[in-house]
Each structure stands twice: as C-alpha cells, then as structure tokens.
Amino acid sequence: MSDDVSTLLRTISWFAEPPSVLPEHIGDWLMETSSMTQRLEKYCAQLTVTLCREGFVSPQSLGEESEQLPPDERYWLREVVLYGDERPWLFGRTIVPQQTLDGTDSALTKIGNQPLGRYLFEQKSLTRDYIHTGCCEGLWARRSRLCLSGFPLLLTELFLPESPVYYTPSDEGWQVI
C-alpha cells in the first residue's frame, strides 16, 4: 500500500485555502488544529499504526515537498497507515530535516509504531505554520508545516476511503457523504 499511496501523494492538487466546494463536514476534518490522532480515536475502539517506511532520504527524493522545508543534506522520512478497528483510515507521511533532529532531539526517529500525534502534541514548543488542503482521485488530504522549538517538519495526511472523514452520523448509523 505504501508505494501506491506515496505515488498518489505526488499527484495531489494543493490549495492554499480550502476550496469553496468542500463539504463542511470534510472541511472541519481537514482544518483540525488539534491532534488528528485524538480525533480519530473518538471513532474507534482501537487505533493502530503500521510503519510502512522509515529512514533518511536525500533532498532529491522529495520532489516539490522540499520547497516546504529549509534545505538540508538529508531528511528523515516516515510513512505510516493509521487503522481504526483494523480499517485503513489515514496514510501519513512525515519529512523531518536533519537540522530539526539536531535542534530538538532525535526522538522523532524512534517513535516506531506509535502515532506521531501522541508525541507532537505533548511538546509545549509545537506550533503550526499552515494547513494546505488537497484532493486526488476523490480522496482528501492535508499538509501542515509544524515546528518544534522553531525547527520545521512537514506532515502530509491522506484520508483513505474508509476514514470517518467521509461519513456523517445519521439516524440510521454512519452515512457516506
């Protein structure tokens, strides 16, 4: 799944501002400023993470994502799928410049199969520069540049088809939007 989704991420059309055609329910998810991990946990009994890819990559392998981060010799890349009750809900891709790891600590490289949000939102120095929304093949995504003690990282989240972002509660249970 990781390679297919990684390829899909490169084709996302990004918007600086959410498009006016965005359904309100989906826009609310995409513009979430708190922990997406905590929000997803409200919709399942168990949220799990499968680590798809992790390690250092060169700037050349990032493509246009490198424009969102300061130049560096190498970047830490982490790709995961978050599952809600064993259903794939979210593909996450985190890119961390080496200088961010040097400037804060290397804990970001040791998260393993824990959700990134659990670590990030425990940090008092966490700030968010922006949220860009995007869409590709009917799937919605968001991209945020976050900073830990002023050092940036890029987080891209693609909401997979079974994600609660595409459903809304109704009298008959959850309905597809």
From Swiss-Prot:
Any one biological process term the GO annotation gives: pyruvate biosynthetic process
SUPFAM superfamilies xrefs: Chorismate lyase-like
Subunit structure: Monomer.
InterPro entries: Chorismate--pyruvate_lyase (IPR007440), Chorismate_lyase_/UTRA_dom_sf (IPR028978)
Disulfide bond sites: none
Compartment annotation: Cytoplasm
Family as reported in the entry's similarity comment: Belongs to the UbiC family.
Annotated catalysed reactions: chorismate = 4-hydroxybenzoate + pyruvate
Protein origin, superkingdom: Bacteria
UniProt KW keywords: Cytoplasm, Lyase, Pyruvate, Ubiquinone biosynthesis
GO cellular component: cytosol
Protein's organism: Pectobacterium carotovorum subsp. carotovorum (strain PC1)
GO MF assignments: chorismate lyase activity
Pfam hit, one: Chor_lyase
UniProt EC number: 4.1.3.40
Broad EC category: lyase
Gene name of the record: ubiC
Binding site for substrate: M36, R78, L116, E157
Known role: Removes the pyruvyl group from chorismate, with concomitant aromatization of the ring, to provide 4-hydroxybenzoate (4HB) for the ubiquinone pathway.
Record bears the keyword Secreted: no
Keyword Lyase: yes
PANTHER family hit by this protein: CHORISMATE PYRUVATE-LYASE
Pathway recorded for this protein: Cofactor biosynthesis; ubiquinone biosynthesis
UniProt name for this protein: Chorismate pyruvate-lyase
